[in-house]
């Protein structure tokens, strides 16, 4: 067994993305909202090994997610406790406090968040005791909120201490350039990135603005809600985890992600693209061949973060196909991409394409605007272009910190001001790392 524990949900964003993900997982595996199998099924879809990665089967035949929900204020988790999927989760896996982090990293990390830490770790330990061979952890949280950034990074630190060698993958909601929910997002993002840089093995960033635009352009939703965004994010998370949950010709496990995508420990922020993203009205007019969806992944309009990969260089690329896909078509599509001059690979990593194929086609939730398609692809690519995202947030951090704006709220919660400069220097070093990695190595060789 290769189980994965989802720490779905640290904070509001994490909880709501978690809801969308578990609704989708349940549909994909044929599990009803009450945790029992759909009529006509004798066992969940995905085979014995597959579904047990994410679900634990009880003696009564109920399937319980290996997941923990965490938030410092009760509202969002109360929605889970009273919602359609309330019977799916173990009540003790829904952990909420009484006061929120007020968009303040220091409250989530040092004061309010720390009070809940023992309860959360205790619950995670109980879930891990039920696992035969724990593979790792999957986090969903936002970088800009107080709970997501503060408590999220505190949990990652603790899990590194308690479960040293286990993989820790994050899906992190990055503050969008235009769609901002709080003024202090740049502070929270820089502080949490600094704290988690050495603890997370691989971080898939998701940018709300990029997903807003996908919903508007591809799904024809004039005013996308957070539910629309979360349904789309859930499809991506499902694609990344599909090869852990279903059989395929080329399966990828958690450790393989970092082995294939992370050339240096600090440079662990792959860019995620997904195709096809089609509304129900357009679905029948598209052929969605393997070649078309593969090419679409290299278009900026299908990326989860606003940046331009055409100006960056690719260090490593992972293509995860789902559904009606044969290896020969994939090889042809990849060869065509490599022949194009638009995709630049770094010169020290010439081949750089890892491929996974899972035969289970993508599923669309009933209330989603996404259409059901026979095949889809999710591309994870480690590209130097994602450094743009760090530059943007660092610049906003500098503008505020030059005036020491809002700093007193953080210091008042027991944080030292020196942490701001330390975190900012670490991110400046991260920007430099990306520049160095993208530089051609021929110049270095001439020195010898």
Curated annotation (Swiss-Prot):
Keywords tagged on the record: Cytoplasm, Cytoskeleton, GTP-binding, Hydrolase, Magnesium, Metal-binding, Microtubule, Nucleotide-binding
EC number: 3.6.5.-
Subunit: Dimer of alpha and beta chains. A typical microtubule is a hollow water-filled tube with an outer diameter of 25 nm and an inner diameter of 15 nM. Alpha-beta heterodimers associate head-to-tail to form protofilaments running lengthwise along the microtubule wall with the beta-tubulin subunit facing the microtubule plus end conferring a structural polarity. Microtubules usually have 13 protofilaments but different protofilament numbers can be found in some organisms and specialized cells.
Active site: 256
Binding site for Mg(2+): 73
Names of the cofactor(s): Mg(2+)
Matching InterPro entries: Alpha_tubulin, Tub_FtsZ_C, Tubulin, Tubulin/FtsZ-like_C, Tubulin/FtsZ_2-layer-sand-dom, Tubulin/FtsZ_GTPase_sf, Tubulin_C, Tubulin_CS
The protein's role, per its UniProt record: Tubulin is the major constituent of microtubules, a cylinder consisting of laterally associated linear protofilaments composed of alpha- and beta-tubulin heterodimers. Microtubules grow by the addition of GTP-tubulin dimers to the microtubule end, where a stabilizing cap forms. Below the cap, tubulin dimers are in GDP-bound state, owing to GTPase activity of alpha-tubulin.
Official protein name in the record: Tubulin alpha chain
Pfam families: Tubulin, Tubulin_C
Enzyme class name: hydrolase
Binding sites annotated in the UniProt record for GTP: 12, 73, 142, 146-147, 181, 208, 230
GO terms, biological process: microtubule cytoskeleton organization; mitotic cell cycle; nuclear division; nuclear migration by microtubule mediated pushing forces
GO cellular component terms attached to this protein's record: cytoplasm; microtubule; nucleus; spindle
